[in-house]
Amino acid sequence: MVWHSGSTPDSHAEIFILNETGWGVVVLTNKNHVLEEASLPEFKKGIINILNGEEPVDIPKNIPIVQIVMSILIFALFITAIVLIIKYKRKKICKKMTWIFLGSLFLILSITLIPLLIYSTNSPWQTIKIFSADVALLISIIVTLLNVNGLISIYIALKSELVNKS
């Protein structure tokens, strides 16, 4: 079998030729989601089985692990924001430097998250937003919540100095 595969940020192409049967197949797909590319080899095996007169293989179910983990992270960040607000309202304030460190950490994470995603997927943010809209939305929510948590933490640090002085 002769086989070639190629991908761009928004499309995927495969060509394979089955020498023993004389069949050749070109599969052009519009990758609507970067994370779904893992199922394409199974798709190819199914086509080969059909051409050989066999039953196609079952493509494994795509469990959206990334989306589930990101949703759990969003929930945790949302709860963290609520806890920070409650701590501020109840005046249960720790050392100022702890809050500044925590706030800075949240802000640094929010600033670096999208560039890290762009670097790790080797795709521009616009492409991620178009072809992985669910991941882009979840990342945007995470960045927003990281910013909110960072700003709340720094606000608590600035107000804690005033509370400790009075």
List PLM regions with ranges:
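Catalytic loop of the DD-peptidase/beta-lactamase superfamily, centered on the K-T-G motif
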Residues: M1-S166
